[in-house]
Regions:
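Central regulatory/effector-binding core of bacterial HTH transcription factors
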Residues: 1-32
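Residues at or immediately flanking beta-strands
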Residues: 2-6, 86-90, 137
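Ligand-binding "clamshell"
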Residues: 23, 33-48, 119-129
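Flexible hinge/capping segments at coil-to-helix
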Residues: 35-68
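A late-sequence structural motif
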Residues: 129-166
Length: 166
């Protein structure tokens, strides 16, 4: 079909703003559960630290985080505050791949999707007093799901990302 596809990649908060300004027809984002998407799947998260250069035992705990208003940042900081652990930002990036690599190489502890776990990571959890965070999903939004081209693209994304129709 004759379609122009413009792809925008960015932090969830930036994509949401573009969606609200009606600059996007289709949006695939990670989000906390809440707003009902066209299709979605749970996004399991893991607390990750470096296996070779563990950081969780440090005081303050160095953290690997998205920038302000980035995903998982609030969950990480609130959890450590609740545990009475002091922390500092060891590395910040808007890139999921960069965060995963930085954590694996010992720059700090992070909370990322399970799919970002690298062989150089160790998974943290109950033994460290860290809770399971299961409140996020990968969500697909479509402005006009009954429009043929948008529907075709949405169906392709549902298949590609292993989403489930809502």
């Amino acid at each position: 079909p004759h379609m122009r596809l413009d792809v925008m990649s960015g932090m969830q908060v930036e994509l949401r703003r573009a969606w609200q300004r009606e600059e996007l027809d289709i949006m695939l984002i990670k989000q906390p559960y809440g707003e009902r998407p066209l299709a979605s799947r749970p996004e399991p998260l893991l607390w990750l630290d470096s296996a070779a250069y563990p950081c969780f035992e440090h005081s303050p705990v160095p953290l690997v985080l998205f920038p302000q208003q980035g995903l998982y940042r609030e969950e990480i900081c609130q959890t450590l505050d609740g545990l009475g652990r002091s922390w500092r930002i060891g590395y910040s990036s808007a890139s999921l791949v960069a965060l995963s690599a930085a954590s694996a190489q010992g720059l700090g502890v992070t909370l990322l999707p399970a799919s970002c776990r690298l062989p150089a990571h160790r998974v943290l959890g109950d033994q460290q007093g860290l809770p399971v965070i299961d409140t996020f999903e990968l969500a697909l939004f479509c402005r006009q799901p009954d429009e043929a081209l948008q529907r075709q693209l949405a169906e392709a994304l549902v298949t590609f990302a292993d989403l489930h129709w809502q």
